[in-house]
């Protein structure tokens, strides 16, 4: 299909995906890698299965990173050299956007004109580069923010650092320039409209998905045996980056009020959590619960599924969460979730049906929520487990890809109409 045919049929054949600050191939739970990485990789894989080629541009973070990594047929990751490989904080990345953009434009220049049909940027840093690429290549820009500075700053954990003003300015520019804006939930759409005055007609709600081939119910005792966890203890799992935003300390403080409960923490320090990488272990010691806290490094997807199967429940106490893939993945394994009633978590978790939503971060309230799930009668616990798995099964990456493609088609159609109007 030629480039002109793409705009005639509103059907993309090749997508340039921008993920400046973190590679989709990075292990979630380390550094800046999390749900966004999973989202970018899974949507790319599913687009490729439908015959749409995807090239993902990300910043190289090691000298050993090859310029091009072929993930599967139809999915390529391009590691763009922009700034030093190591020691560059995410907050310093705006200084390297020019270098990154130059690398993206050079890659496109090596192809025939009209190589990419659409640009999809993830996070505001990528949106800045996408804005330039959109104008240079004369193709539409679709943008997914994933998080917003104003939302994060309104719900900071104690002692956490606020997002800088330059990010708010940068996000506003991207919202103004993008042809379409993709959000995870209706709540996120309302935030874009109220904070950044986004045009509601340009917003598409696209729920993230879950890999139902990996995350599925399994035998709890077998899962615990595989991970070397006690067979006869109640287990509460926390999975994610160790940083104030994710509030792992709330899980420890709440569990300290529940004798006999084991806490499993899987993840690595990130963001402001890097300032005190041993902080959570020190807190466990201060609370006198070190003997019943198990720390695990970030886990592969199959191992993560095993951990979810092993746990009685999973806690997601984040101060801000645009969706909460961890909550969805846990439920896909039949494991109830106790989650903060923030952001997209009320969509990911059905309160009282697949888990519990907790208002605020009062430790006593969290202890009561965890205890309520752990002490539920066996029939009620089994019913909640079944409901959790059934709820998660409605969120597949195939459904996500359907909605994503619909947004791409709208972007191409509207861009084509606007371009013809300008030329008329």
Curated annotation (Swiss-Prot):
The keyword Nuclease does not apply. Its EC number is 2.4.1.250. Homodimer. Pfam families: Glyco_trans_4_4, Glycos_transf_1. It comes from Mycobacterium avium (strain 104). GO terms for biological process: mycothiol biosynthetic process. GO terms for molecular function: acetylglucosaminyltransferase activity; D-inositol-3-phosphate glycosyltransferase activity; magnesium ion binding. It catalyses: 1D-myo-inositol 3-phosphate + UDP-N-acetyl-alpha-D-glucosamine = 1D-myo-inositol 2-acetamido-2-deoxy-alpha-D-glucopyranoside 3-phosphate + UDP + H(+). 1D-myo-inositol 3-phosphate binds at residues 21, 32-37, 90, 123, 147, 167. Belongs to the glycosyltransferase group 1 family. MshA subfamily. This is D-inositol 3-phosphate glycosyltransferase. Catalyzes the transfer of a N-acetyl-glucosamine moiety to 1D-myo-inositol 3-phosphate to produce 1D-myo-inositol 2-acetamido-2-deoxy-glucopyranoside 3-phosphate in the mycothiol biosynthesis pathway. Keywords: Glycosyltransferase, Magnesium, Metal-binding, Transferase. Mg(2+) binds at residues 308-309, 311, 335. UDP-N-acetyl-alpha-D-glucosamine binds at residues 27-28, 35, 241, 246, 299, 321, 329. Transmembrane segments: none annotated.
